[in-house]
Amino acid sequence: MRNITNFLKTFLLWELLKGLKVTGKHFFTRKVTVQYPDEKTPISNRFRGLHALRRYENGEERCIACKLCEVVCPALAITINSTEREDGTRRTSSYEMDLFKCIFCGYCEESCPVDSIVETNILEYHFEERGENIMTKAKLLAIGDKYEAQIAADRLQDKDFR
């Protein structure tokens, strides 16, 4: 009897029919695919996208050249050179970040004592020429200046979790 049952299951392609049943069940349900360039899903305010350097309200850059972000970066993507100013404080003379090395872990953002380096919600960017993947201090400050309102709003909304 067992041999007959196994023969019928094999002959009728029982496993194939079970698979087709699952396919038929889901065939008429609502699709979950998002047509990406035309439709976009909401992005969390904790999203870790392109980096930016922030400034204080008076226009002075926040980075104090403590180099904590450079030390904590597991991918060694950040390089900082600093100079001392006349008043005895340090500031960065160059701040470079290689986005091909960066793994967007967020350690640089967490380690920064003055909230200078942040990761923005920007996820759509590309490079057309060699070397554009190296984000300089000027590029990072420009991104920070452009998106400061959004960065500040995201930080305010997320302050209880920091």
Swiss-Prot record:
PANTHER family: NADH DEHYDROGENASE [UBIQUINONE] IRON-SULFUR PROTEIN 8, MITOCHONDRIAL, NADH DEHYDROGENASE UBIQUINONE IRON-SULFUR PROTEIN 8, MITOCHONDRIAL
Record organism: Francisella tularensis subsp. holarctica (strain LVS)
Binding site for [4Fe-4S] cluster 1: C63, C66, C69, C112
Domain 4Fe-4S ferredoxin-type: 54-83, 93-122
Purpose: NDH-1 shuttles electrons from NADH, via FMN and iron-sulfur (Fe-S) centers, to quinones in the respiratory chain. The immediate electron acceptor for the enzyme in this species is believed to be ubiquinone. Couples the redox reaction to proton translocation (for every two electrons transferred, four hydrogen ions are translocated across the cytoplasmic membrane), and thus conserves the redox energy in a proton gradient.
Molecular function, one GO term: NADH:ubiquinone reductase (non-electrogenic) activity
Keyword 4Fe-4S among record annotations: yes
An example Gene Ontology biological process: aerobic respiration
Family classification: Belongs to the complex I 23 kDa subunit family.
Reaction(s) this enzyme catalyzes, per UniProt: a quinone + NADH + 5 H(+)(in) = a quinol + NAD(+) + 4 H(+)(out)
Cofactor note: Binds 2 [4Fe-4S] clusters per subunit.
Name this polypeptide is given: NADH-quinone oxidoreductase subunit I
Required cofactor names: [4Fe-4S] cluster
EC code: 7.1.1.-
